[in-house]
Each structure stands twice: as structure tokens, then as C-alpha cells.
């Protein structure tokens, strides 16, 4: 079997918001890579076996004392090195060049003039055939003097060194961000570094990843049974499909129907996995328990804890009926792993602690099976399609773990959940019919616990309000509200008010993130 981890790239993270995007772009090329904090134990670099090293951007300044630096082992390794933004600045500063703070930060589009055609830039031109690239800049400092042995390969009208290289050492640096789509030929530059300069084979494909994970899972669990909490979300669905292919009937899924899922989602999950794919699924209808526990609770965090703790309790009860289960499968993905690892100095970014690990009782004493822990979300989706899951399921918009419990403001009641699920289904149905669903990042309805006066027929009505939310985003860290057509919003509003008894008003949320969050609670 092909070893898909033989050719790989190491990315040292200096805290940039785009670091994970660098890794995703390299994976798209077909090469495995990992992200390590810049202050990771340098003695492990040689043992990792990378064919090249990328130094990411970051928010710090190389002109200040104590700024993050690349380990000397990077330069002693003999490997190709590619510094991006801050990565190029520390490359220059550490190797005998100089950096300085700019009079004004440069953020946004820029034109870079190629003045020396090295292995990165040879033959690249703009649409008019000139040796010029449209790129995305985001920096405050810049390289003012290149180190000995380096050549300036690109410049702009604002900074003297937009790119540099030492081709003898195979060390390269660019001040701009090739990983973002605004840099029109950025993927070409990354491919040239990873494939042409580092010599990596493009073995990281969905089909190869599936074969690799099937072999790993079989080796890990042997003849033991595995249990999986199936939620209907993308990650757990792909884990279920992958493990079913790997170990067949040795997998048992536990699907907890909380009463807080999307409209008819429980039936859809059972139809897909139990009936269509033949996966063993235990369906637990727990809506009564959830609504009883949530009665009188309005605080969002309290609701989240109740919903999460009750899931653990129910999952624990069901797992006790599966005496032969020795392993617990989880949908941990690579960003969770990165966020948990963090930086030992605290200078690299740490976003949150990992939300899967530690969520189940200690006494369960089950080994962990995490077949997606090397993958980004977009890779998980591609695996899902390769495994035969419906595209409509694999590319569904994100849905919060607590479900409708955090889309019903205030106290959660069964009647509110049923009303909201139907309103949400109407919104999503109309988005699909208008060919808008795949053009936005996330859309959903929210139940507001306030009543508004309306007129139904000739009678006065005093009924509930539904809010609609749709956003466009790249990373969900920031988001813009989606500018949906007025006629479309009118159609959705009319359907919700006409088809659902108890709703008299529909409003549209036009808040960005920040200052608002995407979810209302």
C-alpha cells in the first residue's frame, strides 16, 4: 500500500491567522503536511522527516527583542525553506540581513514586480504577459537588507524586498501571502516549492487516505467492537462510513434523538446509515428527557451544559449494553489537534481547548479511534463524497452541537423546537430552490421568545417572531451577513407565516461578526 506520509512538509507556525490555510493549500496540491508551533522541541525536526519547511506569517515584529525565531535546526537541516511574511522577515534577520518597521502598514492588494526569475518565479506573468503578480499583503515590518548569499527576486513601489532567495541553499522568502486566493498565482508558487523544489510526490488524495485509514483502524482495533456517537453532522457521518467500510459489523453507532435536531433529521440519519448502508445504529428517542431537563432554564451556557451532560449520560447508558466494545470512535479533526497543542511559550496562537477529548466519563475506559485527526474539514468532506455519502449531507451548513437548544432564545420548549425546525426547513428549502444554498456559508432560523401583533384574515393575531440568519465567511472567525435578494426573503417570510400556525412576523439579521457572533446564543 502507498505510504502517503513519506513525502511531507513541516510548517512552523508563528501565530498567523492564515497558517491553517497554508496547510490546506499544500494538502490540496496532494502533499501531507503538519503544523507545529515555532517553539516546538527543535530536536524533533530531524526525526519528522520533512522534505521542506515553511515558516508562516505572524503578528510579532522582528525589530523587537524577544521576537519569535526559527530554530537553528531549520537552517542546519539542509532542507528547502520557504518564509512567508513574518517567516521571510525572521529568515532575513536570523541569517544576517535586516528588517525595519514600515511607516505605514500594508494591508490588501498589491502588485509585485519580478526582477529575478528563480525557481519560484520563473515564467510567471500577469494577464498582459508582464513579469508582475497580483498579491495580498498584510504586514507592518519589511526586509530592508537581504542576508549574504540572497538575491532580491521581487519588489513593489512601497517595499524594496517583496521576495528573495538563496538558490544554492534552496531558501526562499516572500513578503506577501501565496496561500490566500487574492494572490492569483499563489497556488502555483506553493506547488513549485513543494513539488519542484522539495521533490514531494502528490500522494495525499481522498482515495489513498481512505485506504490508509482502513489499514490503520484494522491494525488498531483488531477484532474488538467499536462504538460511535452518531450525530448526523459531517464529521461523525464520515467516521461512521469509514469505520463501517473498515470493520463492518464490529461498529455500533449510538444516535441520540434529542428533539433539538433539524426537521426530520432523525429519520434521515436512520434511512441513510441503518437502511441504505447497513450500519448498526441504536436510536435513542430522548426528547422527553431533554425537554424535562431544560424546563425553566434560560441561560445559554446552562443550556449547553445540560444538553452536553445529558448526551454523555445517555451515551454511557447505551455503551453499558455493549459489553464487547473496547474502543470509542470520535470525529476529532486536525484543527482540534492544533488548537489543543498550542505553544509552550504562549506566544503562538491558541484558539480553544479541544472539545471532544474529556467529554465522556473516565470510567468508560475505552481506547480512542480518531480516523479524521489528520484532516481539515474540507478534506473530511472530500472523503465523505469518496465514501459514497450524499453531497447534500456532506456539504451541509454547520449545525451547533446543542442543536436548536441554542437557536431558541431563552427557555426551550417542545412547541418552540417544532416550530423552529419547520421554519428552518422552509428557509433551507427555498435557498436550495433558488440555487443560493451553496453560495453562502451558513443559514438558519432563530426562535425569538417574544410575541408580535399581526393580522390573520380579519382577526388580530399575537404570535411568535422568527429571525433568519445567513452569513458569508472563509474561516468563521469573521463573517459578513449575506445580501440575499429582497424577493427571495419575501418568499421565505410568506411561506413561514402562511404555513406555520403561531408565527406572525419574520425578521432578517444583518449583523456582521464582529461585533455579533454567528449563532445568537
Curated annotation (Swiss-Prot):
Q: What superkingdom does the record give?
A: Bacteria
Reactions catalysed, semicolon-separated, are: XMP + L-glutamine + ATP + H2O = GMP + L-glutamate + AMP + diphosphate + 2 H(+)
Q: Does the keyword Ligase apply?
A: yes
Residue ranges of every copy of the GMPS ATP-PPase domain listed in the record: 204-396
Q: Provide the alphabetized UniProt keywords.
A: ATP-binding, Glutamine amidotransferase, GMP biosynthesis, Ligase, Nucleotide-binding, Purine biosynthesis
Pathway entry = Purine metabolism; GMP biosynthesis; GMP from XMP (L-Gln route): step 1/1
Annotated catalytic residues: 85, 177, 179
Which Pfam families does the entry link to?
Answer: GATase (PF00117), GMP_synt_C (PF00958), NAD_synthase (PF02540)
- Annotated binding of ATP, by residue: 231-237
User: What GO molecular-function term can you cite, just one?
Assistant: GMP synthase activity
Q: What's the Enzyme Commission number for this chain?
A: 6.3.5.2
Every Glutamine amidotransferase type-1 domain range: 8-203
Q: What class of enzyme is it?
A: ligase
Q: What does UniProt give as GO cellular component?
A: cytosol
State the function annotated in the UniProt record: Catalyzes the synthesis of GMP from XMP.
Q: How does it assemble?
A: Homodimer.
Give the protein name, as stated in the record.
GMP synthase [glutamine-hydrolyzing]
- Name the species this protein comes from: Xanthomonas oryzae pv. oryzae (strain KACC10331 / KXO85)
Q: Which gene name belongs to this protein?
A: guaA
Amino acid at each position: 500500500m502507498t505510504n502517503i506520509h513519506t513525502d511531507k512538509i513541516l510548517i512552523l507556525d508563528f501565530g498567523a491567522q492564515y497558517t491553517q490555510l497554508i496547510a490546506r493549500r499544500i494538502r490540496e496540491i496532494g502533499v501531507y503536511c503538519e503544523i507545529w508551533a515555532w517553539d516546538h522541541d527543535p530536536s524533533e525536526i530531524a526525526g519528522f522527516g520533512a522534505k521542506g519547511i515553511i515558516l508562516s506569517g505572524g503578528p510579532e515584529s522582528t525589530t523587537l527583542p524577544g521576537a519569535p525565531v526559527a530554530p537553528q535546526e531549520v537552517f542546519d537541516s539542509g532542507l528547502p525553506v520557504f518564509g512567508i511574511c513574518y517567516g521571510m522577515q525572521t529568515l532575513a534577520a536570523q541569517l544576517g540581513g535586516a528588517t525595519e518597521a514600515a511607516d505605514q502598514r500594508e494591508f490588501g492588494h498589491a502588485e509585485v514586480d519580478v526582477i529575478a526569475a528563480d525557481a519560484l518565479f520563473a515564467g510567471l506573468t500577469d494577464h498582459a504577459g508582464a513579469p508582475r503578480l497580483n498579491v495580498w499583503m498584510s504586514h507592518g515590518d519589511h526586509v530592508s537588507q537581504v542576508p549574504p548569499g540572497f538575491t532580491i527576486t521581487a519588489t513593489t513601489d512601497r517595499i524594496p524586498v517583496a521576495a528573495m532567495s538563496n538558490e544554492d541553499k534552496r531558501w526562499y522568502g516572500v513578503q506577501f501571502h501565496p496561500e490566500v486566493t487574492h494572490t492569483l498565482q499563489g497556488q502555483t508558487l506553493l506547488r513549485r516549492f513543494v513539488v519542484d523544489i522539495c521533490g514531494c510526490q502528490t500522494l495525499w488524495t481522498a482515495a489513498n487516505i481512505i485506504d490508509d485509514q482502513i489499514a490503520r483502524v484494522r491494525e488498531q482495533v483488531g477484532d474488538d467492537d467499536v462504538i460511535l456517537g452518531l450525530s448526523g453532522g459531517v464529521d461523525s457521518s464520515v467516521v461512521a462510513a469509514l469505520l463501517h467500510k473498515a470493520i463492518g459489523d464490529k461498529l455500533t453507532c449510538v444516535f441520540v434523538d434529542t428533539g433539538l435536531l433539524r426537521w426530520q433529521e432523525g429519520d434521515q440519519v436512520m434511512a441513510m446509515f441503518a437502511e441504505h448502508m447497513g450500519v448498526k445504529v441504536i436510536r435513542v428517542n430522548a426528547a422527553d428527557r431533554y425537554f424535562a431537563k431544560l424546563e425553566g432554564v434560560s441561560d445559554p451556557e446552562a443550556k449547553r451544559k445540560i444538553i452536553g451532560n445529558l448526551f454523555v449520560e445517555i451515551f454511557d447508558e447505551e455503551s453499558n449494553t455493549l459489553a464487547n466494545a473496547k474502543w470509542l470512535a470520535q470525529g476529532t479533526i486536525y484543527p482540534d489537534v492544533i488548537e489543543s497543542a498550542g505553544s509552550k511559550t504562549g506566544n503562538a496562537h491558541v484558539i480553544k481547548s479541544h472539545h471532544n477529548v474529556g467529554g465522556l466519563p473516565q470510567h468508560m475506559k475505552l481506547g480512542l479511534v480518531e480516523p479524521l485527526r489528520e484532516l481539515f474539514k474540507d478534506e473530511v468532506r472530500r472523503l465523505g463524497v469518496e465514501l459514497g455519502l450524499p453531497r447534500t449531507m456532506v456539504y451541509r451548513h454547520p449545525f451547533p452541537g446543542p442543536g436548536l437548544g441554542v437557536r431558541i432564545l431563552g427557555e426551550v420548549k417542545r412547541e418552540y423546537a417544532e416550530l423552529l425546525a419547520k421554519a428552518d426547513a422552509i428557509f433551507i428549502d427555498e435557498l436550495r430552490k433558488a440555487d443560493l444554498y451553496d453560495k453562502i456559508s451558513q443559514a438558519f432560523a432563530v426562535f425569538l421568545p417574544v410575541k408580535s401583533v399581526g393580522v390573520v384574515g380579519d382577526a388580530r393575531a399575537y404570535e411568535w417572531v422568527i429571525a433568519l440568519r445567513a452569513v458569508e465567511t472563509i474561516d468563521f472567525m469573521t463573517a459578513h451577513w449575506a445580501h440575499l435578494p429582497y424577493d427571495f426573503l419575501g418568499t421565505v417570510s410568506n411561506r413561514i407565516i402562511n404555513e406555520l400556525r403561531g408565527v406572525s412576523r419574520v425578521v432578517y439579521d444583518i449583523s456582521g461578526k464582529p461585533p455579533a457572533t454567528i449563532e445568537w446564543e
